[in-house]
Swiss-Prot record:
Subunit: Monomer in solution; Homodimer and oligomer in the presence of negatively charged lipids forming a pore with a size ranging between 20 and 30 Angstroms.
Protein name, UniProt field: Cytotoxin 2
UniProt record similarity statement: Belongs to the three-finger toxin family. Short-chain subfamily. Type IA cytotoxin sub-subfamily.
General remark: The sequence of the major component is shown, it is called toxin V(II)2 and the minor component is called toxin V(II)2A.
GO molecular function: toxin activity
Compartment list: Secreted; Target cell membrane
Length: 60
């Protein structure tokens, strides 16, 4: 599985066990990702921060 890094078009290969790509962004600025990468479990959204997770190649 390959997930985008914070600055596309760069990406990295996920280590074993981290089989989800995720994108974290502030609710106030949904078009500006704060963090991207590989993760094992999708975190819960909060009032300020949202997470978008998926299990396909480079979809974050």
């Amino acid at each position: 599985l390959k997930c985008h890094k914070l600055v596309p078009p760069f990406w990295k290969t996920c280590p074993e066990g981290k089989n989800l790509c995720y994108k974290m962004y502030m609710v106030a600025t949904p078009m500006l990702p704060v963090k991207r990468g590989c993760i094992d479990v999708c975190p819960k959204d909060s009032a300020l921060v949202k997470y978008m997770c998926c299990n396909t190649d480079k979809c974050n």
